[in-house]
């Protein structure tokens, strides 16, 4: 009986892990449909969103549009593209603000707001769930470097 109980718990635990993985949405980096930016590396995306760079590789200004704290899309984006958790990100920006070296990107409520801001400004860059991409924005290929 003990074996069956343990096996059942193991299967249940596996199902929970699989379910949470499947629930995570694919997050993509987006720019305005008219933006000349064609691709970025993961490091370039991280540098723009962490305040280490305010320019695209072409030299044009890059204006990052963030999503609000606590957003699952935001947490997924920063984990995948910068390797930082929500707590690490908060600590990062606290340090940057305290030393006077910058401010975090403007944050909007959701993917629809990100698209609205980006569609009107070809210098903007943001992130949304892949299923939210439409004709107003273009998903950028991001090289894993």
Describe these PLM feature segments.
Residues 13:
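The feature marks either
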Residues 26-145:
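Exported/periplasmic ABC-transporter solute-binding proteins
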Residues 1-6:
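N-terminal secretory signal peptides that target proteins for export/translocation
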